Amino acid sequence: MYPYLRTLKTIVYARFRTSLHFGDTGMINLRAGFSDIDHYGEINNGRQLTLMDLGRYDLGVRGGLMKVIAEKKWGFAVGGSSIRYRRRITLWKKFQLHSEVIGHDGRWFYFLQKMCLGDTICSSALIKAGVVSKTGLVPAAEVMKEFPDNTWTGELPDWVKAWIEAESQRPWPSSSTK
């Protein structure tokens, strides 16, 4: 089940936290609960990606993007992800979710997110997400026009460019069910 209450709590709390700008890192504290864990007693791999939504909501609210999205009747959609898991987060453990927009390619924004137990990074994800309208993906330049005081360039690190290139080489599955 989607964590609707956590999402609402994250959005409300974000309104009272320090503002962020593109390129800043946001951090929220979470605790692994019963609805997060699998039969191994750790946060399920899919749940980690779901919880990372909360970090992007926190960034969006604190950076003003969610306000722009609401005003323009836009939306926000994930277009791809790559995640690495290194350490378990078990039931009742407090952990931190760090989230940062690290760049854009003109169409998509790329987020680096990591879940940590103290100084130990447990998982790290690269998330490709875009702002969407009724007519499709909104170009990053159009989104950035809404933040005229921002000096962030959005230049992607080389490793993200390599990931984008690798993804472009991956064939899309055929529609056949065979």
Describe every region a protein language model picked out.
Residues 1-16, 85, 89-96, 100-178:
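HotDog/MaoC-like acyl-thioester-processing domains
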Residues 15-23:
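Short, motif-level signal for alpha-helix interfacial/capping segments enriched in acidic residues
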Residues 23-33:
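Short amphipathic
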Residues 36-38:
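Acidic, divalent-cation-chelating loop motifs in proteins
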Residues 47-74:
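Active-site helix/loop of acyl-thioester processing domains in fatty-acid/polyketide metabolism
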Residues 69-91:
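Small beta-barrel nucleic-acid-binding modules, principally OB-folds
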